[in-house]
Amino acid sequence: QECKCHGLSGSCTFTTCWKKMPHFREVGDRLLERFNGAFKVMGGNDGKTIIPVGHNIKPPDKQDLIYSAESPDFCQANRKTGSPGTRGRVCNSTALDVGGCDLLCCGRGQREETVVVEENCLCRFHWCC
């Protein structure tokens, strides 16, 4: 929530307040935190309730993320899902996030390759002095 005062000479005769969205980065960080703590669940016999699977004792609350099926392994090619896998992809060796080699190469290691590209820049030299 953010507020602004109104009035003569800065006196706060009345205040206007409004709800404000958090910064995009903050929203992403919250989602990642919830994703990393997501609960695996299965449906109850009554068809309405969910039951946590595994060693989780506390049932998930309304703000927790839940899932019922494991995600496929995107590291390996899978014809059934149409996933080409990550083998042979270009990665960033210095990045620690999604495009980084540690995550993208799935622990297989990577091969570094330096590519030199020569291009004709159509530059011209002008003698000035």
From Swiss-Prot:
InterPro entries: Wnt (IPR005817), Wnt_C (IPR043158), Wnt_CS (IPR018161). Its main location: secreted. Disulfide bonds join C3-C17, C5-C12, C75-C106, C91-C101, C128-C129. Palmitoleoylation is required for efficient binding to frizzled receptors. Depalmitoleoylation leads to Wnt signaling pathway inhibition. GO terms for biological process: canonical Wnt signaling pathway; cardiac muscle tissue development; cell fate commitment; embryonic camera-type eye development; embryonic digestive tract development; heart looping; neuron differentiation. It is found in: Secreted, Extracellular space, Extracellular matrix. This is Protein Wnt-6.
